[in-house]
């Protein structure tokens, strides 16, 4: 029996056109210490962003003046794209825009922004949290703001290291630079301990989408107008399966399926979460009557069971390639016309556009993650984990100042960095037509967040760590286990206990 899935509010209520793809940008590498980070510059210079005076302004008082005080942000090393502090003479548009964002904040508030980067990506989460314990936990007043890998923010809040943003002077959650659904999903007892949005360039790059190869589609004689399918809410799971059927060709003559062959669809195992959220499912909700956190009725539902069974059956056919880590390439298979559809984060777009290390130009389009049911009536875009979430440390020297800088960074990012990532880069430079750009708008406008994902590192009381994503992604899909109801029931009690802990500690 299908369960009713509630649809959330549309995210990012602004008219920013959606664009991607900067010229071979590399993640910023930095050294520990509140100084300037070193950014490896691309070989090609892109134009600086145009003025964006038509964008909404914040409500920060013009009279704010912190008299040139140093404001130090602790951030995680390893962010895929530049976000924190580029060099002043950076030659690419994104680095320039981040520099201008920071410069505007310094001039508006009369602060001197300094930065300290430490290891803190997926493989260094424990190291990052341990360092927080030695500084914030010891009340040393070293940092005014923390920008953490997304999985760390919930752990930071659970340890009592984060300030309730709603209680601060200048955080304005109703502004367009804070995604509606992120702020609403992360609120517990009317308190919000972290936020992200236009303040994090890496959030924008890590949205999931489906790339499709137009040349291969034409070669196969597929005449469906993909934009029309999306517009008419006909881009669903069944449609994708139908279009990808009988695309398989044994190109390398190796017996059985192999990465050298041609497929209708390809996906890497860590991206499977996108199909869960694209179907409108959640792991955690807020009880409308009590305000308490509960496991979403959709999480353990028969609908998820059905999706898993269909995914596993599909991945067993020659139509699809599910990669469990055997040798997944960043771009080669799609670039070489071996996949008709390829589900990836959007940071894949520059690699496809430039066909790095190849001489081949790729004629491609992008689509939102397909709906599960045709009558779902809404697309849902989830985000990969490598983006930043910002928190105010409990021992910040001046909470009001930290609140002002946080709001100003996000506000200036909305006007400076986001237009570069979206407008000055992909749409005006690389999109071949308005249809491609419109698809990016659909992807961004339907961003979805889930408290169970935001606090995933806390869900470790049962048999599995990070249970809110691990059960679906790894136990069911990677483990080729279709018995979802049994899997869920085995962890349900432990996950409910974690929600009680979160609710108690954050109220």
Label the model's feature ranges.
Residues 1-56, 72-73, 105, 142-144, ...:
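Gram-positive cell-envelope targeting signals
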Residues 51-88, 106-107, 250, 254-261:
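Immediate post-signal peptide segment of exported/extracytoplasmic ligand-binding proteins
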Residues 74-77, 140-146, 150, 188-210, ...:
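Extracytoplasmic/periplasmic solute-binding protein
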Residues 84-110, 215:
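Short, polar/charged alpha-helical segment
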Residues 108-189, 358:
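Extracytoplasmic "Venus flytrap"/periplasmic binding protein-like
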Residues 241-244, 283-325:
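Glycine-centered hinge/linker elements that transmit conformational signals in sensory
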Residues 356-428:
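Extracytoplasmic/periplasmic substrate-recognition and gating elements
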Residues 391-403, 413-507:
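Conserved C-terminal helix/tail region of periplasmic/extracytoplasmic solute-binding proteins
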């Amino acid at each position: 029996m299908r369960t009713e899935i509630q649809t959330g509010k549309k995210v990012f209520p602004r008219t920013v056109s959606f664009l991607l793809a900067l010229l071979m940008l590399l993640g910023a590498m930095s050294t520990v210490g509140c100084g300037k980070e070193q950014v490896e510059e691309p070989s090609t210079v892109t134009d600086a962003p145009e003025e964006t005076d038509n964008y909404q302004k914040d409500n920060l008082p013009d009279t704010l003046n912190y008299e040139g005080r140093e404001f130090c942000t602790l951030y995680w090393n390893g962010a895929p794209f530049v976000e924190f502090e580029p060099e002043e003479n950076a030659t690419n548009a994104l680095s320039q825009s981040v520099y201008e964002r920071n410069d505007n904040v310094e001039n508006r508030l009369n602060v001197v922004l300094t930065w300290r980067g430490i290891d803190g990506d997926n493989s260094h989460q424990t190291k990052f949290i341990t360092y927080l314990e030695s500084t914030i936990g010891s009340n040393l007043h070293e940092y005014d703001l923390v920008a953490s890998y997304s999985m760390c923010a919930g752990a930071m809040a659970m340890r009592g290291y984060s300030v309730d943003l709603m209680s601060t002077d200048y955080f304005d959650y109703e502004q367009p630079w804070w995604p509606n659904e992120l702020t609403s999903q992360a609120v517990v007892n009317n308190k919000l301990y972290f936020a992200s949005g236009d303040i994090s360039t890496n959030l924008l790059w890590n949205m999931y989408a489906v790339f499709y190869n137009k040349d291969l589609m034409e070669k196969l004689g597929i005449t469906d107008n993909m934009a029309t399918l999306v517009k008419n809410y006909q881009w669903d799971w069944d449609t994708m399966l139908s279009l990808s059927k009988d695309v398989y060709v044994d190109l390398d003559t190796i017996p059985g399926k192999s990465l050298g062959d041609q497929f209708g669809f390809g996906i890497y195992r860590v991206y499977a979460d996108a199909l869960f959220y694209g179907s409108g499912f959640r792991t955690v909700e807020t009880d409308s009557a009590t305000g308490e956190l509960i496991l979403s009725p959709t999480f353990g539902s028969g609908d998820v069971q059905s999706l898993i069974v269909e995914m596993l059956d599909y991945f067993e056919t020659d139509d699809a390639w599910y990669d469990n880590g055997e040798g997944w390439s960043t771009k080669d298979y799609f670039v070489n016309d071996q996949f008709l559809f390829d589900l990836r984060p959007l940071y894949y777009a520059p690699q496809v556009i430039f066909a790095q290390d190849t001489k081949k130009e790729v004629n491609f389009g992008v689509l939102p993650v397909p709906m599960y049911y045709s009558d779902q009536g809404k697309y849902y875009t989830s985000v990969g984990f490598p983006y930043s979430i910002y928190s105010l440390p409990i021992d910040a020297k001046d909470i009001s100042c930290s609140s002002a800088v946080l709001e100003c960074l996000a506000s200036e990012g909305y006007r400076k960095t986001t237009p570069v990532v979206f407008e000055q880069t992909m749409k005006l430079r690389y999109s071949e037509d308005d249809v491609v750009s419109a698809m990016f708008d659909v992807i961004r406008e339907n961003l979805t967040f889930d408290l169970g994902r935001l606090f995933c590192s806390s869900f470790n009381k049962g048999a599995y760590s990070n249970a809110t994503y691990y059960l679906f992604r790894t136990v069911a899909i990677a483990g080729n286990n279709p018995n979802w109801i049994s899997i869920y029931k085995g962890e349900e009690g432990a996950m409910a206990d974690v929600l009680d802990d979160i609710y108690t500690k954050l109220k």
